[in-house]
Amino acid sequence: MSDTNKEVVDLVWGRPSGGGVPASLFRRWSQGFVFSETERSALEQFEGGPCAVIAPVQAFLLKNILFNTEGLNWKDISEEEQRTVLCSTLSEILELACLNKSQAFHLVTWPHAKTTDNSDITDSHPEPESSQPTDTPTALATEELGFERFHSVIQKRTLRTVAELKEAVLSLYDTWKNKFGVLLFLYSVILTKGIENIKNEIEDTTEPLIDPVYGHGSQSLINLLVTGHAVSNVWDGDRECSGMKLHGIYQQASVGFLTLMESLRYCKVGAFLKSPKFPIWILGSETHLSVFFTKEMALVAPESASEQARRVFQTFDPEDNGFIPDTLLEDVMKALDLVSEPDYVNLMKSKLDPEGLGIILLGQFLLEFFPDQDSVIPDSFPVYHYNGLKQSNHNEKVSYVEGTALVMGFEDPMVRTDDTPVKRCLQTKWPYIELLWTTERSPSLN
């Protein structure tokens, strides 16, 4: 194993004691990008773990199919369209990870990888027919190639321009869909980003990107694929905590991220992930990632003045109390380019805090400076949910669950729907959302 490969292994898998990475964990991550036979634009996930890579790729894939490709029937794409859209999506994520477009891109692949069917590891390491049952998907790795052997044979390929990158990624389509495609792509993103750059962004460099016990991807890994930055947090910008600077998300993401952990008050997702450029959100449970999406672009309309005010106010309220000390009112008003003359600020303090409690409530602040604005969101619109695990789908066939969403500014008991993990996750963005699914059972977050 080369020094570079060892650095990648340490970053991704850590340095597990007692015999290295468990074979069962490596096997779960050893699959390629494979499209469902039932839903031709949906990727399948064979076992728990690699959703940290597959779900972000699926989210970008949907963005490109729904919004960047004219004349494409997103429910029925051809094999050639699958090839084109998957490879353009992988290239896009690699570009996102590259800090400077003048730097090189790196692809991790097999030595002398071919670009035709039956290529890659099968050529140089033939396996007995019995080791690969015919009914096993081609992207699920065999037991023949263990952890050490895999990392001793993979090689790095360097591309200097975006055009070269796109051409190379397209030519390696069979590599991405067969055997270890997910890991090869993940390693490509890591080397393109730069190992030291990732270490500088991760909060705790002793924590590997893949949990050595359960096999789940870390938040840093998810953020790296979604935003190009391997930061460990989901809030907007940087925060100070006990003299330490903790890094968050720096700009609006193309696809979003919402988590059930926020409904449990373990964290709070910032506006840059909660309000992405396209109406596609990765949903996180305690153990799995799925994708919620719609074609309704009104959901991601430019940030309104009141939404901006809410976001800025909350940066001064990091614990999400719903209020700030009145001493910070002037700073908030300055940040929003409101009149901030001392006399006016004092007048607003007395108006917003008539009882002299020394706090300014978020609701009162928004009501005073940004009275109710008409929502551009339609009363109802079609929505879809994707879960790549077969066992989490009806009849164990990976397909989108369709439904209708109602987003209201108040709770209406007349249209109250079941309380499900998917709904609780979405309520972190739309507190009064209701979901009516076309299936008998609601889609699974796990």
UniProtKB/Swiss-Prot annotation:
E.C. numbers: 3.4.19.12
The protein's name in its UniProt record: Ubiquitin carboxyl-terminal hydrolase MINDY-3
TM annotation in the entry: none
Region: Disordered, residue numbers: 117-137
Pfam families: MINDY-3_4_CD (PF13898)
UniProt keyword annotations, A-Z: Apoptosis, Hydrolase, Nucleus, Protease, Thiol protease, Ubl conjugation pathway
Main location: nucleus
Broadest EC class assigned to this enzyme: hydrolase
Gene Ontology MF annotations: cysteine-type deubiquitinase activity; K48-linked deubiquitinase activity
Family stated for the protein in its record: Belongs to the MINDY deubiquitinase family. FAM188 subfamily.
Species this chain originates from: Danio rerio (Zebrafish)
GO biological process, one term: apoptotic process
Subcellular localization(s) per the UniProt record: Nucleus
GO cellular component: nucleus
Active site positions, chain numbering: C51, H288
Ranges of compositional bias, category Basic and acidic residues: 117-128
Physiological role: Hydrolase that can remove 'Lys-48'-linked conjugated ubiquitin from proteins.
Catalyses which reaction(s): Thiol-dependent hydrolysis of ester, thioester, amide, peptide and isopeptide bonds formed by the C-terminal Gly of ubiquitin (a 76-residue protein attached to proteins as an intracellular targeting signal)
